[in-house]
């Protein structure tokens, strides 16, 4: 099987997580930013991740990929409902979190932005979605205050999380994205959670790029 991704993309992280967790072999292929032709040829639209299955067919949608791969090797890990409290936390933090993360993603060390043209394409895409990225960067102190308050509230929610389940495919990609932000105040429970899930799924954090 072959998994087509962007390295920065939190939805792609979900697909990478299930392969790492199941210890199943997969070839990872990075689609360049600005390349709409490749994903459109595969699934009819510009989207990632895309799983290229052994029979030559293609599967988009991150959680569909998670559930498909989950069924290839026991035990199943992604068949339980998502924890409501964690889901609500993710929804409440996503706005300020991505306002912090996106400007840093545009400057990040990711294979899909390895050429100047690809980086320009990604930056233009995010400016269309988020507006002036310099203005967003200038809001960092206020955004960090909001996100760090949310991180404090997350501590009891992750304290009891040990085995990876469906909820972690929602929570971990968000928190992994946030590790690119210098000053994000992960509490001890969140730090332990990130380290554990990163190790179990073989998905690296972005802490070494934090700015």
Where in this protein do the model-derived segments appear?
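GST-like fold's C-terminal all-alpha helical module
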Residues: 93-195
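Charge-dense, extended regions
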Residues: 203, 207-211
């Amino acid at each position: 099987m072959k998994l087509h991704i962007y390295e920065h993309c939190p939805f792609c992280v979900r697909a990478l997580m299930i392969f790492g967790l199941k210890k199943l072999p997969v070839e990872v292929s990075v689609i360049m930013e600005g390349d709409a032709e490749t994903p459109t040829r595969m699934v009819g639209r510009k989207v990632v991740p895309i799983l290229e299955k052994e029979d030559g067919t293609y599967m988009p949608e991150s959680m569909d990929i998670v559930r498909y791969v989950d069924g290839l090797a026991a035990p199943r890990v992604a068949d339980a409902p998502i924890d409501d409290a964690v889901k609500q936390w993710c929804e409440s933090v996503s706005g300020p979190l991505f306002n912090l993360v996106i400007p840093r993603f545009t400057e990040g060390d990711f294979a899909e932005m390895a050429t100047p043209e690809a980086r320009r394409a990604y930056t233009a895409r995010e400016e269309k979605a988020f507006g002036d990225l310099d203005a967003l960067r200038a809001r960092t102190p206020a955004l960090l205050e909001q996100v760090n308050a949310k991180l404090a509230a997350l501590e009891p929610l992750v304290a009891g999380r040990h085995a990876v389940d469906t909820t972690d495919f929602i929570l971990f990609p968000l928190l992994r994205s946030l590790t690119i932000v210098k000053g994000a105040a992960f509490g001890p429970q969140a730090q332990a959670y990130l380290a554990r899930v990163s190790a179990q799924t073989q998905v690296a954090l972005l802490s070494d790029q934090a700015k």
